[in-house]
Swiss-Prot record:
GO terms for molecular function: nucleoside triphosphate diphosphatase activity. GO terms for biological process: nucleotide metabolic process. CDD domains: Maf. Belongs to the Maf family. The active site is at 79 (proton acceptor). It is an enzyme of class 3 (hydrolase). This is Nucleoside triphosphate pyrophosphatase. It catalyses: a ribonucleoside 5'-triphosphate + H2O = a ribonucleoside 5'-phosphate + diphosphate + H(+); a 2'-deoxyribonucleoside 5'-triphosphate + H2O = a 2'-deoxyribonucleoside 5'-phosphate + diphosphate + H(+). Pfam families: Maf (PF02545). It comes from Rhodopseudomonas palustris (strain BisB18). Its EC number is 3.6.1.9. It is found in: Cytoplasm. GO terms for cellular component: cytoplasm.
Amino acid sequence: MTIWLGSQPLVLASQSYARQMLLQNAGIPFEAIPAAIDERGVQQASGLTSPAEIAARLAEEKALAVSQRLPGRLVLGADQTLALGERTFNKPADRAKATAQLRTLSGRRHELHSAIALVRNGKTVFAETSVARMTMRQLTEAEIEAYLNEAGDAATSSVGGYQVEGLGVHLFDGIHGDHFTILGLPLVPLLNYLRQQRLLAF
């Protein structure tokens, strides 16, 4: 028996390993087809400044881009932004930028805004955005250096320079919010919608 009642697998418009694992662990069959969109360009063209709205727009644009190539398929787009006050962060391009981000976040509380959008035939049928609040402990230069040495590529593959599901958890004093939101996919609202659409067995 499979939990999924859809005639075709869900399409995930992302190459995020964390998002893929969340869907896999929830028993949702999917095909990962990353959306090739210019995220910075979309953000600038939108004129949006709210981290939550930026995440929502990018999630929708990713799903729309993939939906155009796959008529009839249900496509899931997702995005996450990190905000420290009015300032938003992108994935650090290299180790030096990861170091700078961690220095800035050290000893302060920031927010992770995670958004999802479900699109079919170019139309958004469901969208959700949620927030988690993360308090990073005061880090010394030696601790930042040691963390980056151990984290390797994980430090430049996630916004903020950390993956909380891995070694990044050592950087925090407090975490407030949904675990799935922190990992970049508000899973419970997604499952609730799929259940309402009779796409899940229970």
